Amino acid sequence: MYRLDVVTPTGSVFSGDVYQTVITTADGEIGILENHMLLLTNITPGKLRIEKADGEVKEFAVTYGVLDVRGDKVIALVEEVFELDEINVDNEKQLLEEANQKLQNENLSEEEKEHYEKQRSRSQALLNLASAKV
C-alpha cells in the first residue's frame, strides 16, 4: 500500500491508502503499485482508477496535471476531476465543436492553437469516458 493524494486548485478530491492507481499520462496509461520507481510526468485527459486498500474501486475522469510518484507517496495535481456520471455531455459536445471550428482558422496564434487543441483533447476524452459509462 501507499498514500495517494488527488488535488485540484479548489482542494483535495481523494486522500487515502491505495493498492493500485491507473492513470493516463503523456506516455500512455500507467499503473502504479507499491514501491513504484520515482516518476514525475504529465497527466493527460482520461480515466483515473483507484483501487483502495480495502478493495473498493473508485473511478474518475481527470484533465491535465502532474503526477509525482515518490516511494510510498503519490500526488496527482490536476486541473479538474469529475465523477464519471457527472460529466456534462452537452457542454463537452459544445466545447468540442467550438474547438474544432476555431482550429480551422489559419490565423490563430500558437498560443490560441495550443489552447483549442487542449480543449479539443479534454472534451473528447471526457465524452469518451461518459459514453463508456453508459
Curated annotation (Swiss-Prot):
| GO MF assignments | ATP binding; proton-transporting ATP synthase activity, rotational mechanism
Q: Which domain of life is it from?
A: Bacteria
Which CDD domains has this protein been placed in? F1-ATPase_delta
Q: Which intervals carry biased composition (Basic and acidic residues)?
A: 110-120
Query: Matching InterPro entries, A to Z?
Result: ATP_synth_F1_dsu/esu (IPR001469), ATP_synth_F1_dsu/esu_N (IPR020546), ATPsynth_dsu/esu_N (IPR036771)
Annotated segments matching region Disordered? 100-134
Question: What keywords appear on the UniProt entry?
Answer: ATP synthesis, Cell inner membrane, Cell membrane, CF(1), Hydrogen ion transport, Ion transport, Membrane, Transport
Subcellular location as annotated? Cell inner membrane
Q: What does this protein do?
A: Produces ATP from ADP in the presence of a proton gradient across the membrane.
Name of the featured protein: ATP synthase epsilon chain
Gene field:
atpC
